[in-house]
């Protein structure tokens, strides 16, 4: 029986299952947002939590006395903020959070094996809800087993105390952990004897930080959100704000209207870099988009390095 369970565990892939579904063909869009973004957000909110519940959560989204959107890390304005200081992605993310009341309890883990869980998508896992208690995967087992908190703490303590040095441990956490929990967590780690405290921002920005430090002396960006409005030129390499952080499109729109030259470098022409129909403007709702990029350099894959060297 143990050998059979081990075989089942080995079949479980750490990669997400590849599923190609709902594929559509058509002419590529020439702009992002507009009325389709509003209607898509409303449909999602109505389906997930209902318009009333979603709207109640949207009121405080990215406001000074509210809460930060979990969808991306785009900064909030220091001064005036719109009543709807969020994008389509943020509206959908908050609506989903408000609607999800599911829980992953003992019955859930009794039903789903590790192999079965590995065959599901990230979106499916999100819809199952939150953990209600600690779980452990015993050696040779095919299912996670719920345990009480005392046993969970003992398991963690045994592993940590068995290390030759505290620096052999890495205490990874979320960059969106609330201040109180983050303070207690880092206090525990420092008392344990190490400062190995990475969070999710390290995965996103480690490469840019490594390049910025020898270049300008600090591993962080040195601009503020207001600088976008005053910039004479903005270069965007290998990203699509319309997908990654749509609120950036508002800042790019203001910069473009102020005469800024926006140069996009990407092998694929992304709609969000071509034009932006601001859904909070009448012309945007009517589909009249502001052209964003003054130049779109459609380099080949890995051609950005040659371009940068040519710009030196």
Question: Where are the predicted features?
Answer:
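Catalytic alpha/large subunits of respiratory electron-transfer oxidoreductases
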Residues: 2-312
